[in-house]
Amino acid sequence: MQLPQFSELYKSLILIPSISSLEKELDISNKPVIDLLSGWFSELGFSINITSVPETNGKFNLVATYGQGDGGLLLAGHTDTVPFDDDLWTKDPFKLTEKDDKWYGLGTIDMKGFFAFVLEACKNIDLTKLDKPLRILATADEETTMAGARAIAAAQSFRPDYAVIGEPTGMVPVFMHKGHMSEAIRITGRSGHSSDPANGINAIEIMHQVTGQLLQLQRKLKEQYACDHFVIPQPTLNFGHVHGGDSPNRICGSCELHIDMRPIPGVNPDELFMLLNQALLPIIKQWPGAVDVYHLHEPIPAYACNTDSALIKLAEKLTGEAVIPVNYCTEAPFIQQLGCDTIVMGPGSINQAHQPDEYLDLSAIKPTQAIIQKLIEETCKN
């Protein structure tokens, strides 16, 4: 089998739905994408290892390896996309559409299209002349739980020297980002008729106390922690969603608040979760059994790569761009657990990610192909 042309690689990847979602009716297995990539990389002489990701809806990781042993380069990306709003897209999300020097489609830059760039680079390199292994990692569920990357980190089955995650950065190398925590605070009171407030326990009134404590915690985070690489240097705490009660004439029996916290490098998510619980301790003591604090999903740690890394110096040389920090999250903290220097760098703009009519600007194709090819040659040859 001869590998398709670059545009056909892209078209085939976009054609296959691979949405991940916490809503079961939207969640789709990524196996067809994994099988497609497996066939293509096999054709190039890579050995293939496909593993199921535990506790997922039929999700799989793929590791394609050319060469033996540890070291070398890992090029990593995720096979899933976010869901899409059919009413807002003006083009078919699963059909690669060319218009105004752009390729439109779901996953063009976030980030199935990255694998087409990697395949094209591998086609143009004499892989038999590489001295160190080249690995390609395709993961699952990055857009939800990061279960695929977590499984790879837990397995510790290989150890590259360097890793590049091809998320859309405009090919500007990223060396740092904050983490992400989604936490829930549930208040369980006692409902009753609103004509006799003393005959119940109003969960909204307790939640009012909770928000007061959390506002104090916001100030504490700003005063005690800082990473000056970020425009907003402190760990943040955002009030994202609140719901309580069902009728004006009932004492509210339950109320739930969802918050977002963003740890900075050097601050463990467990530390922030402990501070959250400490802030709420007076209320927990005042209302025994009424306050429940729990993770909506497992936290994602912050990430930072040492700026003295040879990988950073190489990426800056190849792109002509200095490394930057970003505010969004990637799989970098989990890939980094393999023991390798890790950066995030890929084609496309983050401004198009998770947006209707997601697109890749065609002017980025040739420069990106050249950079990825040179990156492989520089890291996998002595």
Curated annotation (Swiss-Prot):
Homodimer. CDD domains: M20_ArgE (cd03894). Its cofactor is Zn(2+); Co(2+); glutathione. It is found in: Cytoplasm. GO terms for biological process: L-arginine biosynthetic process. This is Acetylornithine deacetylase. It comes from the Bacteria. It comes from Moritella abyssi. The lineage of its organism: Bacteria, Pseudomonadati, Pseudomonadota, Gammaproteobacteria, Alteromonadales. Transmembrane segments: none annotated. Pfam families: M20_dimer, Peptidase_M20.
